[in-house]
Protein backbone atom coordinates (compact mmCIF):
# COMPACT_ATOMS: atom_id res chain seq x y z
CA UNK A 1 0.00 0.00 0.00
CA UNK A 2 2.88 2.38 0.75
CA UNK A 3 4.22 1.82 -2.76
CA UNK A 4 0.82 2.78 -4.14
CA UNK A 5 0.40 5.91 -2.01
CA UNK A 6 3.77 7.45 -2.90
CA UNK A 7 2.56 7.77 -6.50
CA UNK A 8 -0.82 9.29 -5.62
CA UNK A 9 -1.33 13.03 -5.74
CA UNK A 10 -2.14 14.83 -2.50
CA UNK A 11 -1.40 11.95 -0.15
CA UNK A 12 1.71 11.05 1.87
CA UNK A 13 2.31 7.76 3.74
CA UNK A 14 3.90 9.60 6.63
CA UNK A 15 4.09 6.82 9.23
CA UNK A 16 4.32 3.05 9.07
CA UNK A 17 4.09 1.15 12.36
CA UNK A 18 5.06 -2.50 12.78
CA UNK A 19 6.22 -4.45 15.82
CA UNK A 20 9.21 -5.29 13.61
CA UNK A 21 10.43 -1.80 12.83
CA UNK A 22 12.72 -3.15 10.11
CA UNK A 23 9.62 -4.23 8.18
CA UNK A 24 8.14 -0.77 8.64
CA UNK A 25 11.29 0.76 7.25
CA UNK A 26 11.39 -1.74 4.39
CA UNK A 27 7.92 -0.71 3.26
CA UNK A 28 9.36 2.73 2.52
CA UNK A 29 12.53 1.53 0.80
CA UNK A 30 10.50 -0.83 -1.40
CA UNK A 31 8.51 2.22 -2.45
CA UNK A 32 11.69 3.89 -3.66
CA UNK A 33 12.22 6.19 -0.69
CA UNK A 34 15.88 6.80 0.14
CA UNK A 35 17.08 5.57 3.52
CA UNK A 36 18.23 9.05 4.54
CA UNK A 37 14.60 10.18 4.22
CA UNK A 38 13.38 7.60 6.76
CA UNK A 39 13.48 8.24 10.50
CA UNK A 40 12.87 5.61 13.19
CA UNK A 41 11.11 7.11 16.21
CA UNK A 42 9.61 5.98 19.50
CA UNK A 43 7.00 8.67 20.22
CA UNK A 44 4.64 11.09 18.53
CA UNK A 45 6.73 14.16 19.36
CA UNK A 46 9.69 12.83 17.38
CA UNK A 47 7.35 11.66 14.63
CA UNK A 48 5.81 15.11 14.26
CA UNK A 49 9.22 16.75 14.11
CA UNK A 50 10.34 14.35 11.39
CA UNK A 51 7.18 14.90 9.35
CA UNK A 52 7.61 18.66 9.56
CA UNK A 53 11.08 18.16 8.06
CA UNK A 54 9.59 16.20 5.17
CA UNK A 55 10.79 12.83 6.43
CA UNK A 56 9.03 9.47 6.55
CA UNK A 57 8.56 7.78 9.93
CA UNK A 58 8.96 4.12 10.90
CA UNK A 59 8.03 2.99 14.41
CA UNK A 60 6.99 -0.02 16.48
CA UNK A 61 3.86 1.34 18.16
CA UNK A 62 0.59 2.14 16.41
CA UNK A 63 -0.01 4.74 19.11
CA UNK A 64 2.56 6.96 17.40
CA UNK A 65 0.35 7.12 14.32
CA UNK A 66 -2.77 7.65 16.43
CA UNK A 67 -1.27 10.54 18.40
CA UNK A 68 0.89 12.42 15.87
CA UNK A 69 -0.88 15.76 15.19
CA UNK A 70 -0.22 15.91 11.43
CA UNK A 71 -1.80 12.54 10.72
CA UNK A 72 -5.33 12.81 9.33
CA UNK A 73 -6.20 9.16 8.69
CA UNK A 74 -4.99 5.84 10.06
CA UNK A 75 -5.24 2.49 8.24
CA UNK A 76 -5.42 -0.73 10.26
CA UNK A 77 -3.93 -3.55 8.18
CA UNK A 78 -2.95 -5.87 11.03
CA UNK A 79 -5.49 -8.64 10.53
CA UNK A 80 -5.61 -8.99 14.33
CA UNK A 81 -9.07 -8.58 15.83
CA UNK A 82 -8.10 -7.26 19.31
CA UNK A 83 -5.22 -5.12 18.01
CA UNK A 84 -7.43 -3.79 15.24
CA UNK A 85 -10.02 -2.76 17.80
CA UNK A 86 -7.37 -0.91 19.81
CA UNK A 87 -6.02 0.86 16.73
CA UNK A 88 -9.49 1.96 15.70
CA UNK A 89 -10.47 3.06 19.20
CA UNK A 90 -7.29 5.08 19.75
CA UNK A 91 -7.53 6.66 16.30
CA UNK A 92 -11.06 7.79 17.09
CA UNK A 93 -10.12 9.07 20.55
CA UNK A 94 -7.36 11.12 18.92
CA UNK A 95 -9.72 12.51 16.24
CA UNK A 96 -8.26 10.55 13.33
CA UNK A 97 -10.31 8.98 10.57
CA UNK A 98 -9.86 5.20 10.62
CA UNK A 99 -9.86 2.90 7.58
CA UNK A 100 -10.26 -0.78 8.42
CA UNK A 101 -8.30 -3.06 6.10
CA UNK A 102 -9.26 -5.58 8.76
CA UNK A 103 -12.65 -7.09 8.06
CA UNK A 104 -12.44 -9.40 11.07
CA UNK A 105 -12.41 -6.55 13.60
CA UNK A 106 -15.13 -4.71 11.69
CA UNK A 107 -17.30 -7.84 11.76
CA UNK A 108 -17.09 -8.13 15.55
CA UNK A 109 -17.24 -4.53 16.81
CA UNK A 110 -17.74 -2.39 13.70
CA UNK A 111 -21.12 -0.93 14.75
CA UNK A 112 -19.70 0.10 18.14
CA UNK A 113 -16.67 1.75 16.55
CA UNK A 114 -18.90 3.48 14.00
CA UNK A 115 -20.99 5.01 16.81
CA UNK A 116 -17.87 6.17 18.65
CA UNK A 117 -16.50 7.70 15.45
CA UNK A 118 -19.78 9.50 14.76
CA UNK A 119 -19.74 10.95 18.27
CA UNK A 120 -16.13 12.08 17.80
CA UNK A 121 -16.81 13.68 14.42
CA UNK A 122 -14.52 11.38 12.44
CA UNK A 123 -15.07 8.66 9.83
CA UNK A 124 -14.95 4.94 10.56
CA UNK A 125 -14.94 2.95 7.32
CA UNK A 126 -14.11 -0.32 5.69
CA UNK A 127 -11.65 -0.30 2.84
CA UNK A 128 -12.07 0.11 -0.87
CA UNK A 129 -10.45 -2.82 -2.64
CA UNK A 130 -11.63 -5.44 -0.17
CA UNK A 131 -14.66 -7.34 -1.50
CA UNK A 132 -17.18 -5.69 0.87
CA UNK A 133 -16.05 -2.23 -0.20
CA UNK A 134 -16.12 -3.21 -3.87
CA UNK A 135 -19.62 -4.67 -3.48
CA UNK A 136 -20.79 -1.49 -1.77
CA UNK A 137 -19.68 0.52 -4.79
CA UNK A 138 -21.92 -1.60 -7.02
CA UNK A 139 -24.77 -1.48 -4.51
CA UNK A 140 -24.63 2.32 -4.28
CA UNK A 141 -24.43 2.58 -8.08
CA UNK A 142 -27.46 0.33 -8.56
CA UNK A 143 -29.67 1.89 -5.88
CA UNK A 144 -28.85 5.43 -7.01
CA UNK A 145 -30.10 4.46 -10.49
CA UNK A 146 -33.38 3.17 -9.09
CA UNK A 147 -32.72 -0.54 -9.47
CA UNK A 148 -34.03 -3.00 -6.91
CA UNK A 149 -31.01 -4.88 -5.56
CA UNK A 150 -31.93 -8.48 -4.82
CA UNK A 151 -28.60 -10.18 -4.07
CA UNK A 152 -25.09 -8.97 -3.25
CA UNK A 153 -22.02 -11.13 -3.14
CA UNK A 154 -18.55 -12.15 -4.13
CA UNK A 155 -16.68 -14.81 -6.00
CA UNK A 156 -14.69 -17.50 -4.24
CA UNK A 157 -11.62 -18.99 -5.89
CA UNK A 158 -11.47 -22.32 -4.06
CA UNK A 159 -14.05 -24.82 -2.88
CA UNK A 160 -14.88 -25.02 0.80
CA UNK A 161 -12.76 -27.42 2.82
CA UNK A 162 -13.90 -27.33 6.43
CA UNK A 163 -11.26 -29.89 7.43
CA UNK A 164 -8.20 -27.99 6.20
CA UNK A 165 -5.61 -26.62 8.61
CA UNK A 166 -2.18 -24.94 8.41
CA UNK A 167 -0.47 -28.32 8.01
CA UNK A 168 -2.60 -29.51 5.11
CA UNK A 169 -2.22 -26.21 3.22
CA UNK A 170 1.48 -25.67 3.99
CA UNK A 171 2.67 -26.61 0.50
CA UNK A 172 0.10 -24.38 -1.19
CA UNK A 173 0.90 -21.51 1.18
CA UNK A 174 4.61 -21.78 0.39
CA UNK A 175 3.87 -21.85 -3.33
CA UNK A 176 1.71 -18.74 -3.07
CA UNK A 177 4.04 -16.93 -0.67
CA UNK A 178 1.33 -16.61 1.98
CA UNK A 179 0.99 -17.57 5.64
CA UNK A 180 -0.58 -21.03 6.16
CA UNK A 181 -3.20 -19.64 8.56
CA UNK A 182 -4.30 -17.15 5.91
CA UNK A 183 -4.71 -19.82 3.23
CA UNK A 184 -6.59 -21.94 5.77
CA UNK A 185 -9.00 -19.08 6.52
CA UNK A 186 -9.71 -18.80 2.78
CA UNK A 187 -10.24 -22.51 2.14
CA UNK A 188 -12.29 -23.22 5.28
CA UNK A 189 -14.50 -20.28 4.25
CA UNK A 190 -14.25 -18.12 7.37
CA UNK A 191 -12.76 -15.19 5.47
CA UNK A 192 -15.62 -15.27 2.97
CA UNK A 193 -18.17 -15.47 5.79
CA UNK A 194 -16.66 -12.41 7.49
CA UNK A 195 -16.70 -10.43 4.26
CA UNK A 196 -20.33 -11.34 3.62
CA UNK A 197 -21.24 -10.31 7.17
CA UNK A 198 -19.83 -6.84 6.48
CA UNK A 199 -21.99 -6.63 3.37
CA UNK A 200 -25.01 -7.54 5.48
CA UNK A 201 -24.23 -4.99 8.17
CA UNK A 202 -23.86 -2.24 5.55
CA UNK A 203 -26.93 -3.06 3.44
CA UNK A 204 -29.37 -4.72 5.83
CA UNK A 205 -29.30 -7.88 3.70
CA UNK A 206 -29.07 -11.30 5.38
CA UNK A 207 -27.77 -14.77 4.47
CA UNK A 208 -30.51 -16.80 2.80
CA UNK A 209 -29.28 -19.92 4.60
CA UNK A 210 -26.56 -20.45 7.19
CA UNK A 211 -23.20 -20.36 5.44
CA UNK A 212 -24.75 -19.29 2.13
CA UNK A 213 -25.60 -21.39 -0.91
CA UNK A 214 -22.18 -21.03 -2.53
CA UNK A 215 -23.42 -21.95 -6.00
CA UNK A 216 -21.19 -22.85 -8.93
CA UNK A 217 -21.81 -20.52 -11.86
CA UNK A 218 -20.25 -18.31 -14.47
CA UNK A 219 -21.18 -14.64 -14.69
CA UNK A 220 -24.05 -15.17 -17.15
CA UNK A 221 -25.61 -17.92 -15.01
CA UNK A 222 -25.70 -15.92 -11.77
CA UNK A 223 -28.97 -13.95 -12.32
CA UNK A 224 -31.08 -17.05 -13.00
CA UNK A 225 -29.50 -19.19 -10.30
CA UNK A 226 -30.02 -16.39 -7.77
CA UNK A 227 -33.75 -16.32 -8.44
CA UNK A 228 -36.39 -17.63 -6.04
CA UNK A 229 -37.00 -21.38 -5.96
CA UNK A 230 -40.42 -20.91 -7.55
CA UNK A 231 -38.67 -19.02 -10.36
CA UNK A 232 -36.22 -21.86 -10.97
CA UNK A 233 -33.44 -20.58 -8.73
CA UNK A 234 -32.01 -21.51 -5.33
CA UNK A 235 -33.23 -18.68 -3.11
CA UNK A 236 -35.86 -18.70 -0.40
CA UNK A 237 -35.90 -14.89 -0.30
CA UNK A 238 -34.45 -11.83 -1.97
CA UNK A 239 -32.46 -9.23 -0.04
CA UNK A 240 -29.67 -11.71 0.61
CA UNK A 241 -25.89 -12.08 0.48
CA UNK A 242 -24.06 -15.06 -0.99
CA UNK A 243 -20.90 -16.27 -2.73
CA UNK A 244 -20.22 -17.95 -6.06
CA UNK A 245 -17.61 -20.49 -7.07
CA UNK A 246 -16.56 -19.55 -10.58
CA UNK A 247 -16.40 -15.74 -10.75
CA UNK A 248 -13.47 -14.89 -8.46
CA UNK A 249 -11.88 -12.41 -7.95
CA UNK A 250 -15.00 -10.46 -8.88
CA UNK A 251 -17.92 -9.11 -6.89
CA UNK A 252 -21.52 -8.64 -7.99
CA UNK A 253 -25.03 -7.43 -7.32
CA UNK A 254 -28.15 -8.95 -8.84
CA UNK A 255 -30.74 -6.31 -9.71
CA UNK A 256 -34.14 -5.91 -11.31
CA UNK A 257 -36.45 -3.00 -12.12
CA UNK A 258 -40.19 -2.63 -11.65
CA UNK A 259 -40.73 -0.99 -15.04
CA UNK A 260 -40.88 -3.05 -18.23
CA UNK A 261 -39.40 -0.16 -20.21
CA UNK A 262 -36.19 -0.35 -18.18
CA UNK A 263 -36.08 -4.15 -18.31
CA UNK A 264 -36.47 -4.03 -22.09
CA UNK A 265 -33.59 -1.56 -22.28
CA UNK A 266 -31.42 -3.84 -20.13
CA UNK A 267 -32.08 -6.73 -22.52
CA UNK A 268 -31.29 -4.48 -25.50
CA UNK A 269 -28.01 -3.59 -23.78
CA UNK A 270 -27.07 -7.29 -23.69
CA UNK A 271 -27.61 -7.62 -19.94
CA UNK A 272 -29.71 -10.76 -20.37
CA UNK A 273 -33.42 -11.58 -20.66
CA UNK A 274 -34.22 -10.62 -17.07
CA UNK A 275 -36.03 -10.03 -14.89
CA UNK A 276 -32.80 -10.39 -12.89
CA UNK A 277 -29.53 -8.90 -14.14
CA UNK A 278 -25.98 -9.00 -12.83
CA UNK A 279 -23.77 -5.97 -12.35
CA UNK A 280 -20.30 -7.44 -12.08
CA UNK A 281 -16.90 -6.02 -11.18
CA UNK A 282 -14.29 -8.57 -12.26
CA UNK A 283 -11.58 -7.48 -9.83
CA UNK A 284 -10.85 -6.10 -6.40
CA UNK A 285 -7.40 -4.64 -5.83
CA UNK A 286 -7.15 -5.09 -2.06
CA UNK A 287 -4.71 -2.68 -0.40
CA UNK A 288 -3.94 -0.89 -3.67
CA UNK A 289 -7.40 0.70 -3.42
CA UNK A 290 -7.29 1.39 0.32
CA UNK A 291 -5.87 4.93 -0.08
CA UNK A 292 -9.08 5.91 -1.88
CA UNK A 293 -11.00 5.27 1.34
CA UNK A 294 -8.59 7.46 3.29
CA UNK A 295 -9.04 10.23 0.73
CA UNK A 296 -12.82 9.91 0.80
CA UNK A 297 -12.84 10.14 4.59
CA UNK A 298 -10.55 13.18 4.77
CA UNK A 299 -11.79 15.14 1.75
CA UNK A 300 -15.47 14.20 1.51
CA UNK A 301 -16.19 13.12 5.08
CA UNK A 302 -17.68 9.85 3.82
CA UNK A 303 -17.05 6.16 4.37
CA UNK A 304 -16.65 3.50 1.69
CA UNK A 305 -18.62 0.85 3.57
CA UNK A 306 -20.01 1.35 7.07
CA UNK A 307 -22.46 -0.47 9.33
CA UNK A 308 -26.02 0.86 9.03
CA UNK A 309 -26.67 0.31 12.72
CA UNK A 310 -26.26 -2.77 14.86
CA UNK A 311 -25.19 -6.19 13.64
CA UNK A 312 -27.41 -7.71 10.95
CA UNK A 313 -25.36 -10.87 10.49
CA UNK A 314 -22.72 -12.62 12.56
CA UNK A 315 -20.14 -15.32 11.91
CA UNK A 316 -20.74 -18.14 14.35
CA UNK A 317 -18.15 -20.68 15.50
CA UNK A 318 -18.30 -24.34 14.41
CA UNK A 319 -16.05 -27.12 15.70
CA UNK A 320 -13.60 -28.33 13.05
CA UNK A 321 -12.95 -31.53 15.00
CA UNK A 322 -14.09 -33.24 18.20
CA UNK A 323 -13.01 -31.09 21.15
CA UNK A 324 -12.56 -32.33 24.70
CA UNK A 325 -13.29 -30.46 27.92
CA UNK A 326 -10.12 -28.81 29.19
CA UNK A 327 -8.65 -28.23 25.73
CA UNK A 328 -7.88 -24.75 24.43
CA UNK A 329 -9.03 -23.51 21.04
CA UNK A 330 -7.13 -21.38 18.54
CA UNK A 331 -9.47 -19.34 16.33
CA UNK A 332 -10.17 -19.28 12.61
CA UNK A 333 -7.56 -20.28 10.06
CA UNK A 334 -6.18 -22.92 12.40
CA UNK A 335 -7.05 -26.37 13.77
CA UNK A 336 -10.12 -26.27 16.01
CA UNK A 337 -12.88 -24.22 14.40
CA UNK A 338 -14.23 -22.28 11.44
CA UNK A 339 -16.97 -19.72 10.94
CA UNK A 340 -20.35 -19.68 9.20
CA UNK A 341 -22.45 -16.61 8.49
CA UNK A 342 -25.84 -16.50 10.21
CA UNK A 343 -28.55 -13.92 10.82
CA UNK A 344 -27.61 -11.99 13.95
CA UNK A 345 -30.94 -12.55 15.68
CA UNK A 346 -30.72 -16.29 15.03
CA UNK A 347 -27.15 -16.41 16.31
CA UNK A 348 -28.21 -14.51 19.41
CA UNK A 349 -31.12 -16.88 20.08
CA UNK A 350 -28.74 -19.83 19.74
CA UNK A 351 -26.27 -18.22 22.17
CA UNK A 352 -23.64 -18.90 19.49
CA UNK A 353 -20.09 -17.64 20.01
CA UNK A 354 -18.85 -15.25 17.29
CA UNK A 355 -15.72 -16.59 15.63
CA UNK A 356 -13.96 -13.30 16.35
CA UNK A 357 -14.05 -13.93 20.09
CA UNK A 358 -12.30 -17.30 19.90
CA UNK A 359 -8.53 -17.38 20.41
CA UNK A 360 -5.79 -19.47 22.02
CA UNK A 361 -7.07 -18.59 25.48
CA UNK A 362 -10.57 -19.91 24.81
CA UNK A 363 -11.06 -22.96 27.05
CA UNK A 364 -13.43 -25.81 26.20
CA UNK A 365 -15.75 -26.51 29.15
CA UNK A 366 -17.57 -29.55 27.80
CA UNK A 367 -17.02 -32.08 25.01
CA UNK A 368 -17.99 -30.71 21.60
CA UNK A 369 -18.61 -32.80 18.49
CA UNK A 370 -17.14 -31.98 15.08
CA UNK A 371 -19.58 -29.81 13.13
CA UNK A 372 -21.39 -28.58 16.25
CA UNK A 373 -22.12 -24.88 16.66
CA UNK A 374 -20.22 -23.64 19.70
CA UNK A 375 -22.30 -21.75 22.26
CA UNK A 376 -21.24 -19.64 25.22
CA UNK A 377 -22.00 -22.40 27.75
CA UNK A 378 -19.50 -24.70 26.01
CA UNK A 379 -16.42 -22.49 26.37
CA UNK A 380 -14.75 -19.92 28.58
CA UNK A 381 -13.98 -16.80 26.54
CA UNK A 382 -10.79 -14.80 27.04
CA UNK A 383 -11.80 -11.51 28.68
CA UNK A 384 -8.37 -9.90 28.81
CA UNK A 385 -8.72 -7.91 25.56
CA UNK A 386 -10.77 -4.78 24.90
CA UNK A 387 -13.22 -6.87 22.87
Predicted regions and their residues:
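Rossmann-fold NAD(P)-binding glycine/threonine-rich loop
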Residues: 78-94, 101-122, 127-129
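C-terminal catalytic/substrate-binding lobe primarily of soluble NAD(P)-dependent oxidoreductases
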Residues: 171-387
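Short, ordered loop/turn segments at secondary-structure junctions
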Residues: 18-21, 63, 79-80, 102-106, ...
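Generic secondary-structure signature for well-ordered alpha-helical cores
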Residues: 6-10, 29, 33, 115-123, ...
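Rossmann-like NAD(P)H-binding beta-loop-alpha module
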Residues: 117-121, 125-187
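Structural detector of well-ordered beta-strand residues that form the stable sheet scaffold
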Residues: 59, 99-100, 125, 150, ...
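N-terminal glycine-/serine-/threonine-rich beta1-alpha1-beta2 phosphate-ribose binding loop
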Residues: 1-88
Amino acid sequence: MVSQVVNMKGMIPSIVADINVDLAKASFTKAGIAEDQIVIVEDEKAAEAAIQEGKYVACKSFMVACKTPSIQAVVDATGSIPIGAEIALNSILNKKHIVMLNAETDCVVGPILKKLADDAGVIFTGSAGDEPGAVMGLYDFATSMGFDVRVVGKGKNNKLDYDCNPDTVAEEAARRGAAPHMITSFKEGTKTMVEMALMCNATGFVPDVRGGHGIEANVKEVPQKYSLKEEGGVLNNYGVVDFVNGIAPGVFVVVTHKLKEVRDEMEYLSMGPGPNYILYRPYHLCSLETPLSAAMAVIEGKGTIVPKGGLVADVITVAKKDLKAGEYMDGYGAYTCYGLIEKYETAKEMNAVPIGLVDRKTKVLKDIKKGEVITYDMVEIDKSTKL
